[in-house]
Amino acid sequence: GLKNIQRDHGAASIGALVSPHSTVEEAYLAGALLRGLGSDNVDARLRRAEFVAGEGVQWLGTSIASLSSLQRVLVVGSNLRKDHPLFALRIRQATRQGAQVSAIVGRRELASGNAWALPLTHTVLSDASGWAQALADVAAAVAAAKGVAAPAAGQANAQAQAIAQSLLSGERKAILLGNAAAHHANASSLLVLANWIGEQTGASVGYLTEAANTVGVQWAK
C-alpha cells in the first residue's frame, strides 16, 4: 500500500489528484492523508497548463445573485451557455434590464451568433493564442481614455475602444474569465490584464469556475 511506497520510494513519490467535484470534506481528507505520509503533492487543478505561485483562490469575484443586476460584463474564454448555464441565465436576466455584454472568445466558444441565447454588444473572435493580445488592446484603449500608462503593448482599435467604453460606463460591472481562460497556456497574463482593466474601470474580476466545488477544494487543500 501507500506505506510500502513511502518506505521504498520516499514520500515525494506519492501524489493525489482530487476532483474539483469533490466535497470540501473529501478534499481536506485527501490532503490530510498525503501530508500524514509526508507528501504535499495534492492538487485539484486537473486541466491547468500554467500554475502561478501565490495566485490565491480563484472565485467568481462577486456574488452569484449580483450577476442578475450587472450593467456591464466582459466574458473571456467561455462557452457561457454550455459551460455555465446558471451563470448564463443570471447574465441573460441582466441583459433584459439593459446590461451590455462583451466577449473575447474563439469560434468554438461562440459556435453561432446566438450560441449564448443573449445579445452580445461587442465581440472579439480570436483563437485562444490571441486572447492576451485582445485584452492588451482593451487595456490600451482604457489607458488612452483615462490618460494613464497601459500595462502592456496593445492597439486601441475600434473593437477594443468599444469594449473599453462599455466597461468605463455603468456602475455594476464584471470581467469574467471562463474555463478556457483558466486552462490557457498564458492564464497568468490573462489574469494580470483582466485585473488591471478591472482596477481602472471599477469592474470586479473573477473566474466562472469549472466544476461543482472548484472554490471549495482550493480552500480545503
Regions found by a protein language model. Give the residues of each.
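Catalytic alpha/large subunits of respiratory electron-transfer oxidoreductases
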Residues: 1-221
